[in-house]
């Protein structure tokens, strides 16, 4: 098995808090050093938490690259929402959301009376529940606008992409 994450969101995507790779899986994260949309440093921290054999996990931070480095246009500023200052969201080994966001949901804003009620709402009305979570981000004033995206690195990146899968799947 082979997994290649490109400019992954490693704080808010609900990744496992204590991740573990199966013995036959290789994982490569590729990130732009200048990416201010999904931060490379968050993925560096995530990679350190992954239980794996030596050489099974690698992160490659590309110097001078931004988010969407293979877009085919020069880097430019866009008004996309940036959530880099928002509370982290992880999932424990039982599949439950954990992290600072839970304290905000249950204690500070009292969106749900209990963790069980929050889980049930997520199952029964996921869109409505997501909107409530996003509302917390607004109240926390952790949403900013403005990131830089773009780049013309596809020719430089494609051999790494292809070779990773050839080496690990064929």
Language model: regions and residue ranges:
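The feature captures the conserved acid-bearing segment of alpha/beta-hydrolase catalytic domains
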Residues: 2-67
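C-terminal catalytic histidine-bearing segment of alpha/beta-hydrolase fold enzymes
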Residues: 55-170
């Amino acid at each position: 098995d082979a997994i290649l994450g490109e400019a992954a969101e490693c704080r808010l995507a609900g990744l496992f808090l204590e991740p573990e790779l199966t013995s036959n899986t290789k994982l490569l994260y590729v990130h732009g050093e200048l990416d201010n949309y999904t931060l490379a440093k968050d993925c560096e921290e995530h990679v350190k938490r992954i239980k794996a054999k030596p050489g099974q996990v690698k992160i490659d931070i590309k110097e001078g690259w931004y988010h969407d480095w293979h877009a085919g246009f020069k880097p430019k500023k866009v008004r996309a929402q940036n959530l880099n200052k928002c509370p982290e969201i992880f999932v424990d080994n039982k599949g439950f959301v954990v992290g600072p966001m839970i304290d905000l949901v249950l204690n500070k804003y009292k969106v749900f009376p209990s963790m069980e009620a929050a889980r049930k709402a997520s199952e029964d009305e996921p869109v409505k529940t997501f909107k409530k979570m996003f509302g917390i981000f607004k109240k926390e004033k952790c949403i900013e606008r403005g990131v830089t995206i773009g780049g013309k690195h596809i020719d430089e990146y494609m051999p790494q992409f292809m070779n990773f899968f050839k080496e690990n799947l064929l």
